[in-house]
Curated annotation (Swiss-Prot):
Belongs to the bacterial ribosomal protein bL33 family. The keyword Chloroplast applies. HAMAP family: Ribosomal_bL33. This is Large ribosomal subunit protein bL33c. Gene3D superfamilies: Ribosomal protein L33. GO terms for biological process: translation.
Length: 68
């Protein structure tokens, strides 16, 4: 039997609000918060969004999956 593609894939989550203010204009920040995690491709086919702590914004923000 042949194995299919891996079900679990590694994804990178990036802060949605780092470097942006309410008008969508970029601002000076020291960096962008990123997390590396895994997701199950069968259970979560869409992009992953998790609320994580951003050390640059110094608060909990929504982190979204970035394309590789």
């Amino acid at each position: 039997m042949a194995k299919g593609k891996d079900v679990r894939v590694r994804v990178i989550l990036e802060c949605n609000s780092c470097g942006r203010n309410e008008n969508g204009v970029t601002k000076e920040v020291p960096g962008v918060s990123r997390y590396v995690t895994q997701k199950n491709r069968h259970n979560t086919p869409s992009r992953l969004e998790l609320k994580k702590f951003c050390r640059y914004c110094n608060k909990h923000t929504i982190h979204v999956e970035v394309k590789k």
